[in-house]
């Protein structure tokens, strides 16, 4: 890896993809939205691999595919080798940014990131919830108080935007303040970020499922709502949490939620992850519109800030599961 030596430790992962006959090509939401060989997992990994080896010049055209990934892990789960494509492409982003390459939108994220000192809080709601979905943020704080009593809120960002935009060093430095702590997270992407930093994390939806008898049995909304559960990529394939939200929804709705045809380990991405709404907005929109069409008009309930925002931008009626939990306590 003479051109990008920082990717040497990922050599095996890259070569596993490069020499594979593209068996996971149908798993990627980005290349399904824009059918190009460059955008399938093989193409993205190949572009970074050949750039790292010096076989192609370090140019934007070869760097850009590294950002054509939502981090949904669908290709990993479809792979016989369980190859970590998402993690490898994040390291590729870091290598390209170090060499002055990367999408303009990604550079703006890095320029605008303002490091915050941790407030030492136990409840990590997430920046997207705080900024874009304040009603859910308030519901999360209310839920935590009802379940556990007074809970301090962590106001600092988890640092995930740094990792997604291509600054691994700043991400790791920022994350040191979370190491060794016990935290409850609302957004699964934030949970994975602080977990990688060494925090012990549980999800608020998990804690609600553990105290299921504290939730009033539904329906508490007149029974008129048809709700279809969407498994967020980071909650499901990332953290392996599938049962807790279904336990909670069955309790508060008075019946099991509707399901997408592709669910649990095979659930499909909302298009909201990996900075895709910023770096490839058209592809992100297409992915979200397909998921909304798959919902057949039912209200979508999920547990991920970026998914809520993506689905709403595509015209869907969307509820975050935290608001249902709060209403049932």
Locate predicted features.
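C-type cytochrome heme c attachment motif
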Residues: 26-27, 68-78
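Iron-sulfur cluster-binding electron-transfer modules in prokaryotic oxidoreductases
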Residues: 5-9, 14, 63-67, 77-329
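Ferredoxin-type iron-sulfur electron-transfer modules and their immediate structural context
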Residues: 1-66
């Amino acid at each position: 890896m003479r051109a990008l030596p920082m990717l040497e430790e990922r050599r095996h992962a890259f070569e596993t993809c490069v020499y594979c006959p593209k068996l996971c090509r149908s798993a990627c939401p980005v290349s399904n939205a824009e059918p190009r060989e460059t955008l399938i997992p093989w193409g993205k990994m190949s572009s970074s691999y050949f750039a790292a080896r010096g076989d192609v010049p370090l140019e934007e055209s070869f760097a850009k595919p590294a950002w054509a990934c939502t981090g949904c892990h669908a290709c990993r789960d479809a792979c016989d080798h369980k190859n970590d494509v998402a993690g490898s492409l994040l390291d590729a982003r870091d290598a390209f940014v170090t060499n002055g390459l990367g999408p303009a939108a990604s550079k703006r994220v890095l320029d605008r990131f303002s490091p915050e000192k941790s407030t030492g809080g136990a409840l990590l709601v997430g920046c997207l919830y705080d900024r874009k979905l304040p009603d859910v943020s308030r519901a999360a704080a209310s839920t935590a108080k009802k379940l556990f009593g007074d809970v301090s809120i962590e106001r600092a960002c988890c640092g995930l935007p740094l990792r997604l935009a291509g600054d691994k060093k700043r991400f790791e430095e920022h994350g040191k303040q979370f190491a060794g702590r016990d935290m409850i997270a609302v957004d699964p992407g934030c949970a994975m970020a602080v977990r990688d930093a060494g925090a012990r994390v549980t999800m608020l939806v998990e804690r609600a499922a553990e105290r299921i008898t504290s939730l009033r049995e539904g329906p508490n909304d007149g029974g008129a709502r048809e709700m279809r559960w969407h498994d967020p990529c980071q909650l499901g394939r990332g953290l392996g949490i599938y049962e807790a939200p279904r336990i909670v929804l069955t309790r508060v709705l008075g019946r099991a939620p509707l399901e997408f045809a592709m669910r649990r380990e095979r659930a499909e991405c909302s298009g909201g992850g990996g900075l895709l709404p910023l770096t490839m907005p058209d592809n992100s929109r297409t992915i979200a519109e397909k998921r909304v069409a798959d919902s057949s008009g039912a209200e979508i309930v999920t547990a991920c800030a970026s998914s809520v925002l993506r689905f709403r931008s595509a015209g869907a009626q969307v509820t975050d599961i935290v608001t249902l939990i709060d209403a049932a306590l």
